Structure formats: structure tokens, C-alpha cells
Amino acid sequence: MSTVEDRKQLIQDVLDTYPEKLAKKRSKHLNVYEEGKDDCGVKSNIKSAPGVMTARGCAYAGSKGVVWGPIKDMIHISHGPVGCGYYSWSGRRNYYIGTTGVDTFGTMNFTSDFQEKDIVFGGDKKLLKITEEIEELFPLNNGISIQSECPVGLIGDDIEGVAKKAQKITGKPVIPVRCEGFRGVSQSLGHHIANDAVRDWVFSRDDAQEIETTPYDVAIIGDYNIGGDAWSSRILLEEMGLRVVAQWSGDGTINEMMQTPKVKLNLIHCYRSMNYISRHMEEKYGIPWFEYNFFGPTKIAESLRAIAALFDDTIKENAEKVIAKYEQQTAEVLAKYRPRLENKTVMMMVGGLRPRHVVPAFTDLGMKMIGTGYEFAHGDDYKRTTEYVDDATLIYDDVTAYEFEKFVQELKPDLVASGVKEKYVFQKMGLPFRQMHSWDYSGPYHGYDGFAIFARDMDLALNNPTWGLIKSPWNK
């Protein structure tokens, strides 16, 4: 029996434990990739099965937690009960430069703290009062976003009307975002709603700071600067002669967002969360966009050359110089870590782009991806994934806690790379684990400098001597 058939049988064994209706539903989300096919063969972006443990988030998480929250010079109000703001408070490690509480506010939590009376009588007056208090207490803020939670949508509060009034009072952008958590099937719709808010409430403004443009102006979009990722990417782009005019949302500002329609090229890192606004700018302003990948030296060089190909010979020559500059550093990293990591197997399950984009970094270290999947991918994500995975790779969409544990128990990977919800489950099973949402409090992982840290962290995870003291359940 081939490996493909083995793994298809594994999927069937897992499905056999479910009731018939659930098994039929989940069977559409699990598959084994077969080389040569142009799709991973799984359904996606569908409501999770009721009653199963899913790692997904909500639309509010996608808007406030991913797209808007990292804009550092704005104050983001979690408009609704206190819990949503509390549990989304500074959890993403979006690094930024500034003085917190004075001119930057990324790690602060602002909430309208809805009470029963606000549900009964509405919260519009309270919200307007909050915007006035914010302006008084934090006068150096450059704008406010209103991130609406579930009750706000259910009672029909007019946050758009409040935003317009607040803008007249403060003279600054006040952006209403209808990202109530019940919308859509995952955080993915929150990304889309947040993108639409940028389109309707930011790009439509005419008060952006005037800047001189150059033929080399670019924007980094969809890099949230986890552990400094955007900084390590920006270094390479600037070394090859490009001018990064805007960087959002990680370490980004509202003015940078306003400037973006003036750039010559949008460089998109997280396709899933920011492709909507990139496509809009392509259609309205004629700005092309390119999805780059700065995970691992192979893809870094490939992306730099592809970006340079969109500019003149000077940029093309500079790109080659940048690649050459880091060859020695990369060779030293590979010489040190590849022998220690060669042929180790990995299973991954994350959101966004990482289930495919991080694969080349593992491959550069000689590691093999045997299973990967997304929390909230769409069909085009799985089409893009075929470029990154090998024959017989297990593919799982919106995988349940039960499925993921069973797959790991059977395939016995050397390393599991997933989120904080999964971290302690697998560590208690005696498996090395890396948290791939926030880089396990390390990073950056982007760029050549980031690859050195990535390699070190994988080595620390896999070759830590403590694992020899713990027996996996299947070895007892």
C-alpha cells in the first residue's frame, strides 16, 4: 500500500469514529495531496461543525486583533462587553516604535464596557462620550477605530453616525468597523470587513500628509510585525533600493495607510487577510500587487528577484547584491543547523499564510512537512499550497482537536508547529512544539536575519535534552 493510500486510510479511520452525518461533513475537509494536482482537494471557508473543538476565531478577532489593532497611533475601541477587549489585549506581539500612552497605543486596551442598560437603551451616546474622553486624555492620537462586538450588531446601534459626529468634534479619522463576532464563519470575514473599512473610511479622505513620490515607492501590506518580522523584511527591500512608504498594519500609522494609493507596487505578505484591499487598489488606482515570501533563503532570493523584475535594471542589480551579501551568513546557519535537523518531520496547523509560506524554511533546513492545514483558508489558499507540499502530504482544513491529535499520534512527527491552543496538548504528549502564531515569544522569522533565529529555535525545540526524559504515550 502506498503512502498516499496509507494516509487516506488514516483519514477514514478517524472519520469512522464520528456519527454518520458529521463524518460526511468532515470528510470534505480532509485529504491527501497527490503530486501533479492543482488543488489540495479540500472544502474550506465553511461553518465549523457544531459541538467540535475548532481553533478558529471570530470576525471581531480578524478585524481588531489582526488588521486594525497593530495601527500604532490610533486608539482602537472594543465596543461592547469587556470580555472581547480583555481577551484580545496585546496578544499578538505586534512590535512598534513609540511611547505607549503618548503617541502610540498598541499594547493598551480601550473598551466601552457594555452593561445591561446599554443593551436596553443603546450605546451610541456612551460611545460618543468615550471618543471625547479619548481626545482629552490622549491628545496625540491620530484617530480612533470602533471595533463592534456582537451585542452592538444585534441591537442595531448606529456606530457610523457616531463616527461622523466624532470626526467633526475631533477633526481626526474615526473609523467604524462592523466586525461583530457572529458574522461569517471565522476571523476571515473580519479581515474582509476591516479591508472594506480602510477602503471606505481611510482612502476616501483628502487630508493625507503630502509627500514627494519616487519610481521606487512600495508598501508592505499584511505584515503584522510579529517579533519584528516587518523590520527584518523592510531592511532587504531598502537595501535593494526601494522606498517603503507604508507598512501596515505592524508598526504602521494611519497616515501610512492614507499614502498607500500613491505607491508603485503593493507587496503583500499575508494574502488571506489583505488581498481584498490590494485588489481594490489594483482596480481603482492601477497599483499592481505581489505576494512575496521571506521565509527561508530559497524563497527570499526568489521573492527578491521577482520583486526586482517589476522595476528597472538598477533594482535588479541591487537585488543580486543583496542576495550575495547574505550568502555567507546563510551558509553558516545551514552548516550549523541542517545536520542537526536533517530528515526531521513536521506537522503544521496555523491560520493565514503560514501553513504554506513557512514550509520552504523547514525544507531549507532539510526537514520534511508531512501534514499541513489552515484554520480559516479559502479555496485559493489551498491552490497556492500545492506549490509548497510534496506527494502524500496530509491536508486538513479547520481541523478539530480530536482529528489533529489522532493524526499526530499516528504519523508521529518529530515537531508540531501550531497555535497556543494546541501547544500544551502536544507538549504533554512528549512532543517538541513551536507556537507559530507569535513565534513562541521569539522572532523575527522573516528575512535572512530571521532565518538564523528560526533555525536556532527549531534546533532548541527538537534537540532539547529534556525530551529524552519524557516518553510519548505511544512509546509506553
UniProtKB/Swiss-Prot annotation:
Pfam families: Oxidored_nitro (PF00148)
Keywords: ATP-binding, Iron, Iron-sulfur, Metal-binding, Molybdenum, Nitrogen fixation, Nucleotide-binding, Oxidoreductase
GO cellular component term of the entry, any: molybdenum-iron nitrogenase complex
Reaction equations catalysed: N2 + 8 reduced [2Fe-2S]-[ferredoxin] + 16 ATP + 16 H2O = H2 + 8 oxidized [2Fe-2S]-[ferredoxin] + 2 NH4(+) + 16 ADP + 16 phosphate + 6 H(+)
Residues holding [8Fe-7S] cluster: C58, C84, C150
Superkingdom of origin: Bacteria
Requisite cofactors: [8Fe-7S] cluster; [7Fe-Mo-9S-C-homocitryl] cluster
InterPro entries (alphabetical): Nase/OxRdtase_comp1, Nase_comp1_asu, Nase_comp1_CS, Nase_Mo-Fe_asu
Cofactor: binding comment: Binds 1 [8Fe-7S] cluster per heterodimer.
Binding site for [7Fe-Mo-9S-C-homocitryl] cluster: C270, H437
EC number per UniProt: 1.18.6.1
A Gene Ontology biological process term: nitrogen fixation
Coiled coil segments of this chain: none
GO MF term list: ATP binding; iron-sulfur cluster binding; metal ion binding; nitrogenase activity
Subunit: Tetramer of two alpha and two beta chains. Forms complex with the iron protein (nitrogenase component 2).
Family, as annotated: Belongs to the NifD/NifK/NifE/NifN family.
Primary role: This molybdenum-iron protein is part of the nitrogenase complex that catalyzes the key enzymatic reactions in nitrogen fixation.
Protein name, as recorded: Nitrogenase molybdenum-iron protein alpha chain
Protein's organism: Rippkaea orientalis (strain PCC 8801 / RF-1)
